[in-house]
Amino acid sequence: MQEQVTLEVATPNGVFVGTFPKTTKIEDVIAAVVQDRHLAAGDAFELVHNGEVLQPVQRPLVSFGLTGSVMLELVATGSGV
């Protein structure tokens, strides 16, 4: 069984690719992507997989059945735009 999950995350500032332990929380993945892609840290973001928002963000990747290589979207929410 794989202990790592490779994520390819589409963001407003390009694609983020990174590998995380399967026990990494969604909120920690979001923080890493926001920092790497130089997105506004104060904005609220969600990770979306096949149209489904990955919530609650305290859950680990593995709890959503994410294994191997996975494509996600990072979507800004409630940024007051």
PLM feature segments, named:
Residues 1-81:
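Ubiquitin system architectures
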